[in-house]
Amino acid sequence: MRPSNREHDQLRPVTITRNFTNYAEGSVLVEFGQTKVICNASIVEGVPRFLKGKNQGWITAEYGMLPRATHSRTEREASKGKQGGRTLEIQRLIGRSLRACIDLKVLGENTITLDCDVIQADGGTRTAAITGSCVAMRDAIHWMVQREKIKKMPVFNYVAAVSVGIYRGQPVLDLDYAEDVLAETDMNVVMNEQGHFIEVQGTAEDNSFNREQLNSMLSLAEIGIPQLIEIQKNA
């Protein structure tokens, strides 16, 4: 039995609230159960040095947690003077995932930055950030079209992410914190609306996992992610 009384293949309640803040070109509050993340998309003219003159855009991300997003206060990374390895890893994951949504050439030499701020953490913050940022980014691109910064809305491939893992010997979908801390295996899966995998990150925590368990976890992701993409489209 899962702590939340969910079935092994059941997502937490997921909501996506668009236009959550006033100033960003795209803004979303995404909620996976008690995990809540604000995802703001900002358009900035120009691209990183390695892309200058190539007439294509760039998509990048920043990620952070508020001090009381967790059960006890966590010191802000800014006060420490540097970002931690976990934060850098998550930022890169979000950026890679979102760059799979569109052909970067349609952006011209513009950069979209996704700021993902966790206001409450109960497991799956990075997967929630990816899922919410996809919607925020689409709204930001629509903003670019409205202001004639690009000619037309490009083909947009929705991307979503979910956690899967082995909890008490059973593969489960969308782990909350109570499950995550006891999971024998923890995996994050990113897929697009065609059902193709973009990224799979899996780690054995206490016990190694076999091919059958791996397949079971991927199958659970294939159940959950289409549901998330449907929620994205209906937001």
UniProtKB/Swiss-Prot annotation:
The keyword tRNA processing applies. One of its GO terms (molecular function) is tRNA binding. InterPro entries: ExoRNase_PH_dom1, ExoRNase_PH_dom2, ExoRNase_PH_dom2_sf, PNPase/RNase_PH_dom_sf, Ribosomal_Su5_D2-typ_SF, RNase_PH, RNase_PH_bac-type, RNase_PH_CS. The keyword Signal does not apply. One of its GO terms (biological process) is rRNA processing. It catalyses: tRNA(n+1) + phosphate = tRNA(n) + a ribonucleoside 5'-diphosphate. It comes from the Bacteria. Keywords: Nucleotidyltransferase, RNA-binding, rRNA processing, Transferase, tRNA processing, tRNA-binding. Phosphate binds at residues 86, 124-126. Pfam families: RNase_PH, RNase_PH_C. Its EC number is 2.7.7.56. Phosphorolytic 3'-5' exoribonuclease that plays an important role in tRNA 3'-end maturation. Removes nucleotide residues following the 3'-CCA terminus of tRNAs; can also add nucleotides to the ends of RNA molecules by using nucleoside diphosphates as substrates, but this may not be physiologically important. Probably plays a role in initiation of 16S rRNA degradation (leading to ribosome degradation) during starvation. NCBIfam families: RNasePH. Belongs to the RNase PH family. Homohexameric ring arranged as a trimer of dimers. This is Ribonuclease PH. It comes from Legionella pneumophila (strain Corby).
